Amino acid sequence: MKRRDFIRLSATLGAGAAVPVSLLTGCSSPPLPGSGEVRVSPTVCDICFWKCAGFVHAEDGKPWKVTGNPHDPHSDGRLCTRGTGGIGAYEDPDRLRQPLLRVDEGDGQTFRPVSWDEALEFIAGRMKEIADQHGSDRVAMLAHGSGAGHFKRLLHAYGSHIEAHPSYAQCRGPRQLGFALTYGEDVGSPDRTDMEHSRCIVLIGSHIGENLHNGQVQSLTAALDRGATLITVDPRFSVAAGKSSHWLPIRPGTDIALLLAWMNVVINENLYDRDYVARYTTGFEELRDHVQPFNPEWAWLETGLDPALIRETARLMAASAPATLVHPGRHVTWYGDDTQRERAIA
């Protein structure tokens, strides 16, 4: 450690020691349960699409911690910080605990707490009024998450089928469409990937370890423990890049150029499974002809990546086949060419 860094660190520690103890009381861990009755109930975390199973531990009816279910294949008994932090959301003083009705007050508007009966009567009355005056198909729904299914059934029973999922286009819609166009079906959610048993994993637009799901982080860790090769394509040196054997700091927005160059190398060097392609695919000749102009030297001008690095990583992927995974990613809506990028990944 350099002298300058040591002085800076010492100053930071000294400042921390000077903080009054009273200011740190809010940072203490939650108390352990007392002598009351503790009940453990199974639950499912609904914060993300992984829907990890767990248990809520409650003392005298008050939850005090959440733990993972060891029999759940999504979490393997371990929850992410959002899952274990669910108690914080439950105890949050700003959490809505009853319906609120928008009302006029003076020159503005505010929300007035109402009972569930009053809220449901108000909503039912407005829905009936709209149906009588304009028709039930004048009610639309913008939905997301697991709760959407319940409201969808209500909407259909009401007489409307006008529904949309804006998050589909903002998140994984291009991925689902790209894989459906290539394979005839989409990836699904959770993603149907066997990352744990892969010998080579390619992350291109997939920031696992920073913004993806608990189960995938565990699968990636298990794969690396088994000796898998990790290739990360990312303009920045991400957490995953720090774990990778190869980091490709690509120019933003040029992922398709790299994918085309990889295909060029794999096809022209006969690194693909020709028997599989002949038996199960259509249109391969058209793909082969299409990628001919897109060699690593061409991709270098687009992506800023060394042609030798492009060739090396393409050969690594081919050498590990069929246990090579190019991760499909999530939150894949970036530059307007996202469906085509996902088709290239597929």
State where each predicted segment sits.
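Generic amphipathic alpha-helical segments used as scaffolds and interaction surfaces in large
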Residues: 110, 114, 142-145, 207, ...
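Short acidic (Asp/Glu) and glycine-rich catalytic loops that position anionic groups and cofactors
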Residues: 238-243, 289-295, 322-329
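Acidic/polar loop patches that form or flank catalytic/metal-binding clefts of enzymes
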Residues: 64, 273-274, 310-311, 324-326
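A glycine-rich, hydrophobic/aromatic-adjacent loop/helix-cap motif
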Residues: 317-346
